[in-house]
Amino acid sequence: MDLQKIKNQILDGRNLCIEDAYELENAPLNELLEAANEVRAKFCGNYFNFCSIINVKSGKCSENCKYCAQSAHFDTKCEIYDILPFEKIMPLAKLNDDAGVARFSLVASGKGLHKKDDLQKVIEIYKKLKSHTKFHLCASFGIVSKEILAELKKSGVKTYHHNLETSRKFFPKICTTHTYDDRINTIKSALCVGLDVCSGGIFGLGESLKDRIDMAYELKNLKVSSVPINILTPIKGTPLENSAPLCVDEILRSIAIFRLILPHVFLRLAGGRNNLKNSVKTALNGGINSAITGDFLTTCGDVAQSDKNLVSECGFVYKKSFDV
């Protein structure tokens, strides 16, 4: 396995084949990170993109995803509430907008927006956000129909978020209340109605590096434009509460391989970045070019500023708005 040759092939515009991707498990980590950074610079430039989310509906989810605090199947003591009113959403939205965050997403627990009044509520919220902010608006509402996705697009949503979470092979070990194809079909429906798609997964569910690579190729085949990388934070009360954390080198290796497989995407550092400990900068110099900043109804201005300082130190130029 010749890493230099693989890197040059990718820089020349050729795809990394899955067999070579599997072999990268044994590549020297520093060289792998350098290759990923070079590929990111070639295909994405030095621009960095931030997004923020708000959990507009919490708890009582019918699905049994083993990592999730919001599943009704587990006793996690998570907060439970229905769709928040716009008046509770706008303060966080304004903080993010003023801080220069590019993207803002409403996220709701549950398999999908199956109550008609929930759909109408979020549509009205999006219309108001569109008129009051400069955000690229995103939505994350689970498994929904093409008709609902079209309605969301009409209300101002530009990107739909729906993770694959892991590989097709490993998925049944994580969730049994819906299928991998349910998720893929939702992504295809979003693309069909003209939405961009943000889809990634969680590292540290018990999967292998091969599973992560398989997921990356699923995402590549779907042609998603943004790929969030979450690192499991075990939640007390879930079946994964005692999961052993991934070592930092394993996380960094996985991120770098994702970049080599997916040269053009926003590779987005998302939940659980604290698992990287003191190596966040290494991840930023190893393939990452976007991130989630802030948190639900917290003062996000300082967080966004500290994150912007961090990416500037890594040589990125922060840009509030640019094409996918």
Curated annotation (Swiss-Prot):
Its EC number is 2.8.1.6. Keywords: 2Fe-2S, 4Fe-4S, Biotin biosynthesis, Iron, Iron-sulfur, Metal-binding, S-adenosyl-L-methionine, Transferase. Pathway: Cofactor biosynthesis; biotin biosynthesis; biotin from 7,8-diaminononanoate: step 2/2. Pfam families: BATS (PF06968), Radical_SAM (PF04055). Disulfide bonds: none annotated. Residues 43-273 form the Radical SAM core domain. GO terms for molecular function: 2 iron, 2 sulfur cluster binding; 4 iron, 4 sulfur cluster binding; biotin synthase activity; iron ion binding. NCBIfam families: bioB. This is Biotin synthase. It comes from Campylobacter hominis (strain ATCC BAA-381 / DSM 21671 / CCUG 45161 / LMG 19568 / NCTC 13146 / CH001A). The gene is bioB.
